[in-house]
């Protein structure tokens, strides 16, 4: 197990936040200052910052900090402390090669997310969603412990590096099923739509970003069973594309969109070649960034758990928010020349080059179906007439735009658009990270 400055800094901030009320502005300034100090004082060649574990940690850190800044709170709240726990668990997950340490990280991650979802106790929907997540997550954790026990009984060690080359080990199979559950891959996806619908925006961002990044980082290091991952990939593509067609709630649409994205992420992992894994990580980063833009951008004109038809209210918002939201939706739909198309093209081309032609054709069909309901959002934003039953929300619900949300939306949008102009800024970093995973 290798710890470095990531975990140390997060642990120090976590301890301080438990004792003092840290202002968000001071926290952001400290984060920026610490980042600049690390950039100018650390020897990147000796530290191997561009290794696979380092890149996953940096991504978890960045998206975690963005999630903490969501909202209009002036100080770090108890929810933000729980998000810190999720960030620390995600970082240690990709640092360790011990099965018990990995189990503790999964539990810390699950329990923190469970409390984040259920923190508003006066909402029955949130309580229901948190209980579903907790119970089903406990079942997957039990499968993980059973797999770890089988490995320990047979091999006498708790190091998962000894099972990397074992394709049909029962212990490895159970561990893979537990990790795929955390990732939300079909047929282990049944909890995602209900949990997403019962989550508010901050819980939704935590649930849809940090676990996916950390679990994907572990899956690449495990080199999983190709046939098991392929079955889950194809089922995820079909379920995510077909299941979202008739959805009326935004959160449920995002849930099936996440399942479809999981299918493409696992699709590159099936190839077991360099450019396939590189394409999967590029797709994961761009999907996470665009997911953040959609959630934060829709929050500017809509409420939590809104209907999709309410996107017609976005015409009353500033034009820049509409443009950014539209570009993000088109990107995640895979419309060229946006970043989402680039990521899907890299993943599908890597699969075709390794002989998965029929699976690639199926993925293209599923991407076309998925693009249809993304384009439906664009149609509602620009061409849908306003409905009379939505007028009461305009009158009774104030339209608040916290400054932090606007800053996050601008920075994330700049990143997604900048990738179109200079894709090497992301691909070169992921290139070196992927090399280190082989």
Question: Which positions does each model-derived feature cover?
Answer:
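Alpha-helical transmembrane segments of multi-pass membrane proteins predominantly involved
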Residues: 1-438
């Amino acid at each position: 197990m290798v710890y470095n400055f990531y975990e140390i800094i997060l642990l120090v901030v976590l301890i301080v936040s438990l004792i003092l009320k840290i202002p968000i502005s001071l926290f952001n300034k400290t984060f920026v200052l610490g980042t600049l100090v690390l950039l100018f004082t650390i020897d990147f060649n000796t530290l191997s910052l561009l290794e696979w574990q380092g890149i996953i940690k940096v991504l978890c850190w960045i998206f975690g900090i963005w999630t903490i800044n969501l909202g209009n709170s002036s100080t770090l709240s108890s929810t933000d402390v729980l998000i810190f726990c999720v960030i620390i668990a995600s970082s240690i997950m990709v640092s360790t090669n011990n099965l018990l340490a990995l189990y503790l990280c999964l539990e810390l991650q699950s329990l923190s997310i469970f409390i984040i979802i259920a923190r508003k106790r006066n909402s029955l929907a949130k309580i229901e969603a948190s209980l579903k997540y907790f119970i089903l997550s406990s079942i997957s954790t039990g499968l993980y412990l059973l797999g770890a026990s089988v490995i320990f009984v047979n091999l006498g060690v708790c190091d998962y590096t000894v099972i990397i080359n074992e394709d049909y080990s029962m212990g490895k199979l159970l561990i893979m099923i537990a990790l795929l559950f955390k990732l939300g891959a079909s047929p282990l996806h049944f909890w995602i739509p209900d949990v997403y619908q019962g989550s508010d925006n901050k819980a939704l961002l935590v649930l849809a970003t940090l676990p996916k990044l950390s679990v994907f980082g572990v899956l690449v290091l495990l080199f999983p069973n190709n046939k098991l991952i392929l079955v889950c990939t194809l089922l995820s593509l079909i379920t995510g594309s077909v299941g979202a067609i008739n959805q009326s709630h935004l959160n449920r649409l995002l849930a099936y969109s996440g399942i479809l994205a999981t299918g493409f992420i696992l699709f590159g992992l099936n190839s077991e070649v360099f450019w396939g894994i590189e394409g999967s990580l590029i797709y994961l980063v761009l999907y996470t960034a665009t997911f953040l833009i959609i959630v934060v951008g829709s929050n500017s004109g809509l409420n939590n758990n809104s209907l999709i038809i309410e996107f017609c209210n976005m015409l009353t918002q500033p034009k820049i928010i509409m443009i950014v939201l539209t570009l993000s939706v088109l990107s995640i739909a895979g419309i060229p020349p946006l970043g989402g198309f680039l990521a899907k093209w890299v993943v599908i081309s890597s699969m075709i080059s390794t002989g998965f032609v029929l699976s690639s054709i199926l993925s293209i069909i599923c991407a076309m179906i998925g693009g249809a309901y993304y384009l439906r959002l664009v149609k509602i934003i620009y061409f849908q007439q306003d409905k009379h039953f939505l007028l009461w929300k305009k009158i009774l619900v104030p339209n608040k735009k916290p400054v932090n949300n606007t800053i996050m939306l601008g920075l994330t949008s700049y990143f997604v658009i900048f990738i179109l102009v200079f894709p090497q800024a992301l691909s070169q970093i992921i290139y070196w990270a992927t090399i280190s995973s082989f």
